């Protein structure tokens, strides 16, 4: 599985540099200057961790991180200070590899410095197929695998060497559209906010709180996703050595079986 936060922040760095004691946004470039590792890991890791049932039947066990040297980061600081930046800790590109207890591998990338199209990857590679969200959405399945999913291929030579044709992909997406998107998807597009994502997440938060349900993310998610920064820094500062993940669940990572969204009643699952 792969996830990433690749977002060229060139238009925003003037706002992300400290411009006084009361500057609320100015922490970011300074923080990158002082810290190695994936310092914005939640964007890439969160959805991947949920897809792989992390602490719901599996756990992240070992991490190895590597980064490029800083070129753009140093230039950004020098441009704003007029002085030489002798050390900028965060590399222009950071890659973190994680192995889980059940033998899965996760790759997470972080790059906010170099010119690239916006990308969060979200790639899942399984034994029966492949799914990719960024930079281009696509799914790769053999004809028999697509048929087994309930969608009949309209071409004779369908195989997993390329993405599904548009007709088959649309049919697959429609058949398996998530109930949360069925309810909030169109409204989210109208309201906006990061393409509607903000609205969907806020709506789920309100729904869970109103109905006394477990939230879609819990405190263990928070700890697991955020510790990637410190563990990656520890790995790279020690020659890109393997670093063990703490078990924040204290041995309970295999109690819950699979990631699930909570609903007030079973019949509400189809509409909420």
Label the model's feature ranges.
Residues 6-8, 68-71, 112-115, 129-130, ...:
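Short, solvent-exposed loop/turn segments at secondary-structure junctions
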Residues 1-88:
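Predominantly a Rossmann-like dinucleotide-binding segment in NAD(P)-dependent oxidoreductases
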Residues 49, 115-127, 132-135, 141-272:
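C-terminal helical cap and adjacent loop that interface with cofactors, partners, or active-site loops
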Residues 60, 93-95, 119-121:
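Short, acidic/polar N-cap/turn motifs at the starts of alpha helices
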Residues 42-43, 87-92, 100-101, 115-116:
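A short catalytic or substrate-binding loop motif that flags glycine-/basic-rich loops and adjacent residues
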Residues 96-102, 126:
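Active-site beta-strand termini and strand-to-loop segments that position acidic
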């Amino acid at each position: 599985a792969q996830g990433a936060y690749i977002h060229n922040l060139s238009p925003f760095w003037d706002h992300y540099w400290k411009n006084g004691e009361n500057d609320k946004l100015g922490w970011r470039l300074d923080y990158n200057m002082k810290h190695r590792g994936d310092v914005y890991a939640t964007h890439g890791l969160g959805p991947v961790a949920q897809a792989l049932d992390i602490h719901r039947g599996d756990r992240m066990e070992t991490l190895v991180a590597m980064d490029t040297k800083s070129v753009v980061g140093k230039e950004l600081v020098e441009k704003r200070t007029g002085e030489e930046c002798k050390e900028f800790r965060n590399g222009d590109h950071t890659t973190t590899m994680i192995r889980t207890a059940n033998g899965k591998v996760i790759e997470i990338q972080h790059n906010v410095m170099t010119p690239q199209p916006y990308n969060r990857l979200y790639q899942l590679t399984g034994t029966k197929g492949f799914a990719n969200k960024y930079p281009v959405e696509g799914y790769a399945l053999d004809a028999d695998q697509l048929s087994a999913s309930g969608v009949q291929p309209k071409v004779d030579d369908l195989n997993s060497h390329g993405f599904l044709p548009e007709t088959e992909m649309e049919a697959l997406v429609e058949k398996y559209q998530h109930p949360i998107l069925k309810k909030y998807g169109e409204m989210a597009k109208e309201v906006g906010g990061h393409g509607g994502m903000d609205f969907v997440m806020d709506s789920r938060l309100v729904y869970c709180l109103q109905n006394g349900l477990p939230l879609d993310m819990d405190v263990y998610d928070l700890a697991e996703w955020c510790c990637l920064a410190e563990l990656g820094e520890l790995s790279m500062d020690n020659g890109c050595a393997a670093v063990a993940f703490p078990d924040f669940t204290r041995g309970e990572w295999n109690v819950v079986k699979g990631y699930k969204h909570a609903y007030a009643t079973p019949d509400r699952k189809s509409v909420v």
